[in-house]
Amino acid sequence: MSQVWTAELRTEEGKGASRRLRHAGKVPAIIYGGDVDAKSIALKSNQIERALKLDVDLYNSVLTLEGAGDAENCIIKDLQRHPATGFITHIDFQRASDKAMVTKRVPLKFKGKESSPGVKMGGLMSFMQTTVEVSCLAKDLPTAIDVDVSELEAGTNLRLSQLTLPKGVKLTALTHGNTDYDQAVVGISKVKR
């Protein structure tokens, strides 16, 4: 289900205008993509902070932005935070139409770690990648990709090509047609005796 956020159109741009917005409890943002010009908007910072704390999958979800003209479906493309305070300073949204492909990093959720034969034999599980870059339609964008490691033996790796992906989702690393990009995702080291 898509979350609906309220935004307002920004008329002033630049460092000073953005600073005034932040002091007023708002976050400057921009919506870009598609065949439409970029649109500068502002959102309430407490609304964004609350939503991100409650739903960490928002980074890979389609959001609806209302109040700045027509309602637009978007994904969060970039979110910038202040280095000392952690407050959100700017957000980039990319328009997400049903016909346009989006490319986004998606987290991997590893399942069955404790029941893996390699771990039961005393092997150590190593995670080489915890996120992967996928390309798909916005409506097919997964919030996470489940990786079953319950059958992984000691001394073996699970590679990108062995991941089970949702329908319509492709790994960008494998679209090159070269097996050099088929990297290991997770592996279990052999037991030393």
From Swiss-Prot:
InterPro entries linked to this entry: Rbsml_bL25/Gln-tRNA_synth_N (IPR020056), Ribosomal_bL25/Gln-tRNA_synth (IPR011035), Ribosomal_bL25_b-dom (IPR020057), Ribosomal_bL25_C (IPR037121), Ribosomal_bL25_long (IPR001021), Ribosomal_L25_dom (IPR029751), Ribosomal_uL5_bac-type (IPR020930)
Gene Ontology BP term (one): translation
Keywords: Ribonucleoprotein, Ribosomal protein, RNA-binding, rRNA-binding
Record SUPFAM superfamilies: Ribosomal protein L25-like
Pfam families (UniProt xref): Ribosomal_L25p, Ribosomal_TL5_C
Molecular-function annotations in GO: 5S rRNA binding; structural constituent of ribosome
GO CC list: cytosolic large ribosomal subunit
Highest taxon, organism lineage: Bacteria
Entry similarity comment: Belongs to the bacterial ribosomal protein bL25 family. CTC subfamily.
Subunit structure: Part of the 50S ribosomal subunit; part of the 5S rRNA/L5/L18/L25 subcomplex. Contacts the 5S rRNA. Binds to the 5S rRNA independently of L5 and L18.
Protein's job: This is one of the proteins that binds to the 5S RNA in the ribosome where it forms part of the central protuberance.
Protein name: Large ribosomal subunit protein bL25
Provenance organism: Hydrogenovibrio crunogenus (strain DSM 25203 / XCL-2) (Thiomicrospira crunogena)
Native organism taxonomy: Bacteria, Pseudomonadati, Pseudomonadota, Gammaproteobacteria, Thiotrichales
